[in-house]
């Protein structure tokens, strides 16, 4: 279930320390901010560091309809660079959108897809938790270890044609 208060968090993390595999949900903007949310709920740093092994953040986005997907000429390399694409990536990428067809009920979308990020709570992350690193500091450490953000995954999905620019903005704009 969802961890809504300190008591529930403490029970879940203590169960994890005794060898139980614990899955739970917590509303946060991204994986690194989960750590600071637990700290803000009053959970001791040592408990978070010792009990957490992996944090997954996710968003659901509508998938471009593969039957009516067309190039999105409104999305030019400048727009893609504003999203964080390199100049080279932006010049090679081709954005798509669904124009609408009977198979997608004229919406341009067919199905949903997950956009994820996975934070491995490694030794450097555990050490950062113990020294009460901020969310940006945790993210920076994780990125150095190969962490891919939801924005990174979203950009790959735009480049592959599965996700359109507007849906990326709708789902990830507050990030």
Briefly describe each language-model feature range.
Residues 1-175:
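Short, flexible helix-loop junctions that flank or precede catalytic/ligand sites
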């Amino acid at each position: 279930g969802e961890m809504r208060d300190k008591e529930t968090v403490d029970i879940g993390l203590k169960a994890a320390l005794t060898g139980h595999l614990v899955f739970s949900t917590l509303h946060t903007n991204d994986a690194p901010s989960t750590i600071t949310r637990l700290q803000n709920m009053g959970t001791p740093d040592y408990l978070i560091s010792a009990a957490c092994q992996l944090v997954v953040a996710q968003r659901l986005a509508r998938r471009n309809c593969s039957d009516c997907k067309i190039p999105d000429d409104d999305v030019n390399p400048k727009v893609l660079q504003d999203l964080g694409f390199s100049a080279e990536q932006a010049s090679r990428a081709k954005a798509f959108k669904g124009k609408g067809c009977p198979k997608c009920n004229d919406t341009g979308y067919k199905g949903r897809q997950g956009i994820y990020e996975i934070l491995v709570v490694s030794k450097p992350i555990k050490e950062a938790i113990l020294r009460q690193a901020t969310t940006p500091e945790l993210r920076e450490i994780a990125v150095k270890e190969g962490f891919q953000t939801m924005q990174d995954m979203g950009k790959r999905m735009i480049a592959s044609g599965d996700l359109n620019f507007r849906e990326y903005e709708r789902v990830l704009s507050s990030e």
